[in-house]
Design a protein with these regions (language model features):
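Signal peptide-directed extracytoplasmic domains
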Residues: 1-128
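Bacterial extracytoplasmic/cell-wall-associated proteins, especially those involved in peptidoglycan
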Residues: 73-77, 88-239
Length: 239
C-alpha cells in the first residue's frame, strides 16, 4: 500500500478507504508495473495477480555457456546450471533446446522453462523421425550433433543444405570434418578469439575435428530447425 501511495501521490488513508469500500482485502504477491498508471488500474492488477511478464530468447547458435549467462542475467532463478536438471534421453546436455521466445514471471524457476524447451525439441525430432525417411544413415543423436556444426558454419539459411552435403560427404568417405567451430567449442569457456596452429594440432581436444575422425561427442550449440532439416534431408554432395 505504501509503495502504491508513494508512486501515485495518493494519501495512504484515502487509499485504505478506497480498498475498504471496494471490498478489496488482499493483494496477490508478485512484481507489478505501477508507474504512470491510475490507482484503480494498479489496485485491479494487484487484486487479480496481473504481474509483469518477462521473456527470454533462446537463440539458435547459443551454447551452454552463453545460455547459463543469459539465465543469470534474467529474472529467472537459475536452479539448472548448465542444464544439469534436464530430464533427457540424450547422453549430452548441449544443444538439446528448441530455439524460441519463452515467457515467465520474476522468480520463476529456470528449470521449468528449460525442460519445456527441451520437450518441444524432443517432440519435433520424434515427429520428424516418424513422418519421413531419413536421407542418410545418421541417427537422431548424430543428426543433432551435425546440425549444430552446420548452424555455426552457415552464414545464412541458403548455405545450410550445401554445408550439410559437404559434411555428409566427408563422413561417408571417412574424412575428417575439419570444422573450425568445433575447435572453438572445445576451447570454451577460455577461447580468446583466435584459433592457433597449436589448437588445430591439439589431439587432446575431443572436439577438434581436424584431429578426430567422425563427429564430436556432442552438439556444439543449439540448432535451428532449418539446420536440423538440412541434415535430416541432406545427401552427400560431390564436393
Amino acid at each position: 500500500i505504501s509503495e502504491v501511495a508513494k508512486h501515485n501521490f495518493v494519501n495512504k488513508v484515502f487509499l485504505k478507504y478506497f480498498l475498504y469500500f471496494n471490498k478489496i482485502k488482499t493483494f496477490k504477491s508478485g512484481e507489478y508495473d505501477i508507474y504512470g498508471k491510475p490507482m484503480s488500474e494498479i489496485i485491479f492488477d494487484m487484486n487479480e495477480g496481473n504481474t509483469i511478464t518477462h521473456k527470454i530468447l533462446i537463440n539458435e547458435g547459443t551454447n551452454i555457456y552463453d545460455l547459463n549467462n543469459l539465465i543469470n542475467d534474467s529474472m529467472l532463478v537459475n536452479d539448472c546450471q548448465f542444464l544439469s536438471c534436464i530430464k533427457t534421453d540424450f547422453n549430452f546436455k548441449e544443444g538439446i533446446l528448441y530455439p524460441d521466445t519463452y515467457f515467465y514471471k520474476k522468480g520463476n524457476l529456470a528449470s521449468n522453462i528449460l525442460q519445456k524447451s527441451h520437450d518441444r525439441l524432443k517432440k519435433y525430432l520424434d515427429e520428424l523421425k516418424y513422418s519421413q525417411n531419413n536421407n542418410n544413415n545418421l541417427d537422431i543423436n548424430e543428426i543433432l550433433i551435425l546440425s549444430s556444426i552446420v548452424e555455426k558454419e552457415a552464414g545464412n539459411n541458403n548455405e545450410k543444405k550445401l554445408i550439410a552435403g559437404v559434411f555428409l560427404n566427408r563422413l561417408e568417405k571417412n574424412m575428417r570434418l575439419q570444422a573450425d567451430p568445433t575447435i572453438i567449442y572445445g576451447l570454451l569457456p577460455n577461447f580468446d578469439g583466435d584459433i592457433k596452429k597449436s589448437n588445430i594440432l591439439d589431439r587432446n581436444n575431443k572436439y577438434n575435428t581436424y584431429m578426430i575422425n567422425g563427429l564430436p561427442p556432442s552438439p556444439i550449440a543449439i540448432s535451428s530447425i532449418s539446420s536440423i532439416d538440412a541434415v535430416f534431408n541432406g545427401k552427400p554432395g560431390k564436393f
